[in-house]
Structure formats: structure tokens, C-alpha cells
A protein has these predicted regions:
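Dinucleotide-binding Rossmann-like beta1-alpha1 core, especially the glycine-rich loop
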Residues: 45-129
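Flavin (primarily FAD) binding-site architecture
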Residues: 200-215
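Glycine-rich FAD pyrophosphate-binding loop
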Residues: 21-41
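Central beta-strand plus flanking loop segment that forms part of the substrate or channel wall
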Residues: 47, 218-240
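Extreme N-terminal leader/targeting segments of oxidoreductases
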Residues: 1-4, 19-23
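Beta1/beta-strand and adjacent pyrophosphate-binding region of the FAD-binding site
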Residues: 1-12, 28
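Helical element adjacent to the flavin cofactor pocket in flavoenzyme catalytic cores
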Residues: 140-189, 193-196
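Short hydrophobic core segments
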Residues: 7, 193-203
Length: 241
């Protein structure tokens, strides 16, 4: 009898598995494909504080994100590295004072941080072979953290295994029957697992698992957060983004 069966091998699933097994629980994780084969390998590949959330006054979220960024930097320096972002000032979008206050707040909310703080830059004089248009005269630099997202998933999974978790790949959950005090879960290879609890960490497939597999009725809907990432050739030799 397992204490916990986790459905989904993305960053949430393996992170929960690592945490739970570290607390002494008997854990099995089931993934229908490979680890990080879906959303967790399609991210922005950034661990960031969410600077844009300052405009909607979500200060607690930004503070928590910045603290977690420092945690990742300290425990996984081999797969993460600081990256500087250059934010050109466009006068008709935001005034200079607003950008500066926002970045000062971004630095302050992070508390004691090891990444370089934000600063003002002259875009025409501070960079060699500046590729930006001439009408961009000034801007600001700030720091965030880039990371290998898929590798972060694999490292969490490996640590969970080392602590005693069972991770089953290329094997989907086909049925889950609720008994009085446990779940009986059937996998696609006909294997049966009994578990005290199930965590549905299947990302955009959570409602499918809930309704079709666990037979749980719900009127809840799923709001997907989607974005587009554009990859372009590097235009100059600087390290900034």
C-alpha cells in the first residue's frame, strides 16, 4: 500500500514526489510518456520574480517568486545562470520614474539576493555595437535566472528515486476505483497499485484524469495559461537579453 500516487511526470509531479518521499511517505509516480515531455520542457526557461506582476500590485507573489529564485540558484547552480535583461525606455509606454521605481521595488522585494541589482544604462554609450534603434537613448538593466527546465525535472526525479520513490514511465493510468480508505489504480500494463491518496499533477490533462479516470464529477473548468516564445538569431556579442 502506497501513501501517495502521483499522476504526471512534469516539474510539479516530480517536485511533489521528492518532497513527499523526503517526509517519509511511500510514493509512486506514474507518467504516460517520458519525464518533462510536455509543458515542463516548453517553458521560458527562466526562474524569474515576475516583474510584470508589480503593475497589478501582486507584491506577495513577486516576493515569493524572488525568494524561490534564490533557492534554485543555491541548490542548482550547475543548471542555472544569471542573465541580464535590458529594458529600453519607450516614452509613450511608461515614464522613466515609473520604471525606476518598479525596478527598485523588484530589488527590494527580493531581500538579500545574490544577483546584480538593476541599474540605469545609456543605450548609445554603454554598449559596443549597440544593435538597438537610435531613438532608444536610455533604459535599464535588471537580473533574473535562466535554467535548463527539463534537466531540473530530471534532477528532482533522480533525487526522489534516491530517497525511495518509485517512478514509472511510459505507462498511463487507465482506471482508479475509490474504496473506503484507499484507491485501487490500474495502469495500462494491467499493474494494480493501491494507494491512500492520489495527486493529479497532469497539467492541462487534470480534468480528463479527474472525470474519465477517477470518475469524479465536477463543474470546475480549467483556465490554461499559454504564451508564445520567439527564438531569433543573436544580433550582437553582449550577454544581455
Amino acid at each position: 500500500m502506497q501513501d501517495l500516487l502521483i499522476i504526471g511526470g512534469g516539474i510539479n509531479g516530480v517536485g511533489i514526489a521528492r518532497d513527499a518521499v523526503g517526509r517519509g511517505l511511500k510514493v509512486t509516480l506514474v507518467e504516460k510518456g517520458d519525464l518533462a515531455s510536455q509543458t515542463s520542457s516548453w517553458s521560458t526557461k527562466l526562474i524569474h520574480g515576475g516583474i510584470r506582476y508589480l503593475e497589478t500590485y501582486e507584491f506577495r507573489l513577486v516576493r515569493e517568486s524572488l525568494k524561490e529564485r534564490e533557492v534554485i540558484k543555491s541548490i542548482a547552480p550547475h543548471i542555472s545562470k544569471p542573465i541580464r535583461f535590458v529594458m529600453p525606455h519607450v516614452s509613450h509606454l511608461r515614464p522613466v520614474w515609473l520604471i525606476r521605481i518598479g525596478l527598485l521595488l523588484y530589488d527590494w522585494l527580493g531581500g538579500f539576493i545574490t544577483l546584480p541589482k538593476s541599474k540605469y544604462v545609456n543605450l548609445q554609450n554603454d554598449y559596443i555595437d549597440n544593435p538597438l534603434m537610435e531613438n532608444f537613448q536610455k533604459g535599464y538593466e535588471y537580473s533574473d535566472l535562466s535554467i535548463d527546465d527539463a534537466r531540473l525535472v530530471l534532477l528532482n526525479a533522480q533525487d526522489a528515486i534516491n530517497r525511495g520513490a518509485e517512478i514509472i514511465l511510459n505507462n498511463a493510468v487507465k482506471n482508479a476505483i475509490r474504496h473506503d480508505d484507499y484507491w485501487e489504480v490500474e495502469l495500462s500494463d494491467k499493474k494494480i497499485i493501491k494507494t491512500k491518496a492520489i495527486i493529479n499533477a497532469s497539467g492541462p490533462f487534470v480534468l480528463n484524469i479527474l472525470k474519465d479516470i477517477c470518475k469524479v464529477k465536477t463543474n470546475k473548468s480549467l483556465r490554461l495559461v499559454q504564451g508564445s516564445h520567439l527564438i531569433v538569431k543573436k544580433l550582437y556579442e553582449g550577454e544581455q537579453a
